[in-house]
Amino acid sequence: MARICAITGRRPVKGSIINRKGQSKKSGGIGTHVTTITKRKFRPNLQRIRVKLPNGGTKRMLVSVKALKAGLVEKA
């Protein structure tokens, strides 16, 4: 099962963690330098909930919390 919101289509996106070393120029150093860049994923906050469908039935779906808070989904 893909980790994708059934309502908004939110999915994991790629990003990176950037590690820096050194003292910033602002605080009297010669500047910071990038030492490593590590790949990572930003995952949406998905919850498996029972959703009321327009025809009156219910169905379990993976829904992002952002969609729940916005009122795009009605919990059964």
Curated annotation (Swiss-Prot):
Q: What does the entry list under GO cellular component?
A: ribonucleoprotein complex; ribosome
Query: HAMAP family this protein is in?
Result: Ribosomal_bL28
Q: Which family does it belong to?
A: Belongs to the bacterial ribosomal protein bL28 family.
Query: SUPFAM superfamilies from the entry?
Result: L28p-like
Look up the domain of life of the source. Bacteria
Cited PANTHER family: 50S RIBOSOMAL PROTEIN L28, LARGE RIBOSOMAL SUBUNIT PROTEIN BL28A
Source organism per UniProt: Opitutus terrae (strain DSM 11246 / JCM 15787 / PB90-1)
What is the name attached to this protein's record?
Large ribosomal subunit protein bL28
Alphabetized, the UniProt keywords read:
Ribonucleoprotein, Ribosomal protein
Q: Which Gene3D superfamilies match?
A: Ribosomal protein L28/L24
Tell me if Ribonucleoprotein is a UniProt keyword of this record.
yes
